[in-house]
């Protein structure tokens, strides 16, 4: 993550300090149990019984875990306990559920600095998550990680928005283009963009480094399978069912075999339809 001297009202700040204060303020309504669960999931040798005990302490997370374990995809027979659910789902699915709970806490209210209503930011996130996952599936890559980076790639906007509301009279941010989005105005405001704050937030919540890195570098040229998938996710939320008017990265298009343009348009249309179904089910 690039090191930049941030200043608001001529007071220097740094991303780790801002994010620690943000989390301590309760602005992101996550229980202590949820943070402990993610810490355990990031460890390869966690104890499933201990994990189940922490899950029991958060009703929302426990309910989602039980619902997933009893879904048609996983359920060969009814799953009656949270212990059974943990063993049935495994680390990847539990991490995905955690990401959904985190996104639901962070992305369901208006972002005033960006003049975006809650429904808009949630839609952006779902479309990017579905797009990234479908891109990963196309190449047999890590679908769960792709979904996670798509779902959470805008979470740093919440941190910047919390700073913006504390500085009355600040101008609202403008979406410039696909390559930069709101980052131009974010940098004018506090010296840094939302990907850096988002990456730091996820780092402090002990997300895998691959997720953190991909969030931090989302405006750089894609350099690996996960950043390729997120690029497609971002394209998916920019697509409106007509010609996509962006100078897209040809390396990504070729990686997913999406030439000619009509093939890309067809794939983005499929993503749009799947994302709309996901929105209705959420």
Language model segments and positions:
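Conserved alpha-helical "signature site"
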Residues: 1-167, 182-247
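Post-HEXXH active-site segment of zinc metalloproteases
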Residues: 165-177
């Amino acid at each position: 993550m690039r090191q930049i001297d941030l200043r608001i009202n001529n007071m220097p700040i740094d991303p780790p300090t801002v994010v620690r204060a943000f989390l301590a303020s309760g602005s992101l309504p996550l229980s202590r149990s949820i943070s402990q669960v993610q810490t355990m999931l990031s460890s390869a040798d966690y104890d499933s019984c201990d994990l189940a005990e922490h899950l029991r302490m958060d009703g929302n997370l426990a309910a989602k875990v039980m619902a997933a374990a009893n879904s048609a995809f996983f359920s060969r027979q009814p799953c009656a306990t949270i212990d059974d659910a943990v063993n049935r789902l495994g680390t990847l699915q539990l991490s995905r559920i955690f990401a959904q709970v985190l996104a639901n806490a962070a992305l369901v209210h208006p972002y005033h600095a960006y003049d975006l209503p809650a429904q808009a930011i949630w839609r952006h996130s779902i479309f990017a998550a579905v797009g990234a996952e479908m891109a990963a599936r196309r190449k047999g890559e890590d679908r769960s990680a792709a979904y996670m980076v798509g779902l959470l790639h805008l979470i740093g906007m919440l941190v910047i928005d919390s700073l913006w509301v504390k500085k009355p009279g600040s101008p609202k941010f403008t979406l410039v283009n696909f390559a930069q989005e709101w980052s131009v105005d974010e940098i004018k405001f506090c010296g840094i963009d939302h990907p850096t704050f988002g990456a730091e937030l996820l780092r402090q919540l002990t997300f895998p480094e691959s997720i953190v890195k991909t969030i931090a570098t989302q405006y750089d040229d894609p350099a690996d399978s996960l950043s390729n998938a997120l690029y497609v996710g971002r394209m998916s939320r920019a697509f409106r069912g007509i010609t996509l008017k962006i100078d897209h990265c040809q390396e990504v298009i070729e990686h997913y075999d999406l030439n000619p343009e009509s093939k890309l348009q067809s794939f983005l249309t499929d993503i749009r339809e799947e994302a709309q179904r996901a929105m209705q089910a959420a």
